[in-house]
C-alpha cells in the first residue's frame, strides 16, 4: 500500500458541488428531511461565485485537472448564477481542453441560459439531464420540476450542437415509457442511459408532505427487488445516538469482515494515473462523492447509511478539510484520508465496501 493516496500533485479530477439550491424536491434526496419537502437542517443554501472559485482553484491548479464534475447531492449546479462564468474561466485559463460534466434536472432558468451554457462547453464536455419519464411521469420522482421547462432546456441546449446525455432512473411508473424516451432522445441527438435508483430503504419509497404524511409511494421497476433490512440492523441504528463510537469501533469495522470482496476505489481512476476528490459547497474536501454525500445527510429516525455515517464522522473528526481555512494543497499534504485507505483491507470501512467492493450494493449515479 502506498504511503499516501490523494496527493495534491496527483489530482486529475474534481467533483465540485457548485450549489445547494434546487428547484426539485426528489423524495430520497439528502437535501430534504426524511422524504419530505422540508430542508435538511444541516444545509446552508448558497452557490459558488466566480471569485470564490478562483480563490479555491487558482490558474496553476487548473492545468493539472482533466475532468470537472459539477453535480451535487444537495443542490443542482445549474442554479448557480455564475456557472457559465466559472466554465469560461476554466476553458480560458486551462492550456488543454478539460472535460466538464454537468448533472442537472433541467427544470430551471430560461432558453437564453441553456443556449449560452451549450455554447460555453468545449468539445470534451457535456450535460447530463436527469429526467425520469415523460410529461405524465417525470414529476412523480422529480417533484416540482415543470415539464415544459425541461423540454425548453433540452431543445435549446441541443440546438447549440453541444453534447447532451439523458439519464433516466427506472421506476415501475415510468418503465413503460422507455421506448418513447429513446425516440425523444434521438430527436435531440442525445445518448440515453437507464439506471436503477437508490432510495428504497427496505420498503417502497415514500413521498411525504411537509407534515411527513405519505402522499404516495414509489416502486422500483418490475423484476427489481427491494432489499429487506434486518430487524437487528434497524434496532442498532436506532441506538446509535446514545452510544459511544469508541466502544463499538471494533464491532463496526468487523461488520463486513466475511465479505469475499476487495475494494477498488473509484476515485483512483485513469486520468493520467491520478485521483479524484469531492468538494462540497461549504468548502469541505472529501475522498469521493459518497463521503461528501454522507457528510451532511440528516438521518434522524432513519436506518440506511446511519452506521456508515457514524463511522465516517469518527474517521474525520480530527481533520481540517475546509478550503475556507486552508489551501487544497495544505489539506491534502496533511494526509487527511489516511483513516480511509489504511483500512480498506478486510472491508473495515463500510461505505467503501458498499460502493467500491466487488459486490457493489449501490449503482454509481455519476457517469
Residue locations for each model-derived region?
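Recognition helices and adjacent regulatory flanks at domain boundaries
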Residues: 1-11, 24
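Terminal, non-catalytic domain-edge segments
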Residues: 2, 362-367
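Radical SAM enzyme [4Fe-4S]-AdoMet core and its adjacent flexible, acidic
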Residues: 9, 17, 32-48, 62-63, ...
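Conserved beta-strand->loop/alpha-helix structural units within folded catalytic cores of enzymes
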Residues: 12-28, 72, 166-170
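Local cysteine-cluster metal-coordination motifs and their immediate loop/turn environment
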Residues: 21-31, 350-361
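Conserved SAM/AdoMet-binding glycine-rich loop
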Residues: 21-24, 31-35, 50-133
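Signature of lipid phosphatidyltransferase scaffolds
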Residues: 325-334
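Immediate flanking context of iron-sulfur cluster ligation sites
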Residues: 335-351
Amino acid at each position: 500500500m502506498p504511503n499516501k493516496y490523494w496527493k495534491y500533485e496527483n489530482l486529475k479530477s474534481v467533483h465540485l458541488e457548485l450549489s445547494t439550491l434546487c428547484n426539485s424536491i426528489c423524495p430520497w434526496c439528502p437535501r430534504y428531511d426524511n422524504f419530505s419537502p422540508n430542508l435538511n437542517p444541516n444545509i446552508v443554501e448558497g452557490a459558488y461565485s466566480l471569485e470564490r472559485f478562483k480563490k479555491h482553484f487558482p490558474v496553476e491548479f487548473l492545468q493539472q485537472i482533466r475532468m470537472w464534475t459539477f453535480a451535487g447531492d444537495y443542490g443542482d449546479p445549474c442554479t448557480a448564477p455564475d456557472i457559465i462564468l466559472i466554465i469560461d474561466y476554466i476553458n480560458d485559463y486551462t492550456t488543454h481542453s478539460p472535460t466538464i460534466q454537468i448533472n442537472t434536472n433541467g427544470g430551471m432558468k430560461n432558453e437564453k441560459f441553456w443556449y449560452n451554457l451549450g455554447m460555453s462547453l468545449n468539445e470534451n464536455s457535456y450535460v447530463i439531464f436527469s429526467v425520469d419519464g415523460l410529461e405524465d411521469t417525470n414529476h412523480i420522482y422529480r417533484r416540482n420540476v415543470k415539464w415544459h421547462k425541461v423540454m425548453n432546456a433540452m431543445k435549446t441546449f441541443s440546438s447549440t450542437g453541444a453534447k447532451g446525455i439523458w439519464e433516466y432512473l427506472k421506476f415501475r411508473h415510468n418503465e413503460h415509457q422507455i421506448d418513447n424516451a429513446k425516440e425523444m432522445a434521438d430527436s435531440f441527438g442525445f445518448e440515453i442511459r437507464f439506471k436503477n435508483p437508490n432510495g428504497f430503504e427496505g420498503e417502497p419509497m415514500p413521498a411525504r408532505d411537509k407534515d411527513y404524511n405519505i402522499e404516495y409511494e414509489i416502486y422500483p421497476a418490475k423484476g427489481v427487488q427491494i432489499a429487506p433490512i434486518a430487524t437487528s440492523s434497524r434496532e442498532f441504528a436506532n441506538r446509535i445516538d446514545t452510544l459511544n463510537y469508541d466502544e463499538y469501533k471494533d464491532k463496526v469495522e468487523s461488520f463486513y469482515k466475511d465479505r469475499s470482496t476487495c475494494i477498488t476505489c473509484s476515485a483512483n481512476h485513469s486520468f493520467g494515473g491520478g485521483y479524484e476528490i469531492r468538494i462540497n459547497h461549504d468548502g469541505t474536501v472529501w475522498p469521493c462523492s459518497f463521503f461528501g454525500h454522507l457528510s451532511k445527510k440528516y438521518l434522524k429516525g432513519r436506518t440506511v447509511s446511519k452506521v456508515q455515517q457514524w463511522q465516517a464522522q469518527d474517521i474525520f473528526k480530527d481533520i481540517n478539510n475546509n478550503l475556507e481555512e486552508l489551501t487544497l494543497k495544505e489539506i491534502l499534504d496533511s494526509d487527511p484520508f489516511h483513516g480511509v485507505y489504511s483500512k480498506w483491507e478486510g472491508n473495515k470501512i463500510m461505505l467503501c465496501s458498499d460502493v467500491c467492493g466487488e459486490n457493489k450494493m449501490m449503482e454509481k449515479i455519476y457517469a
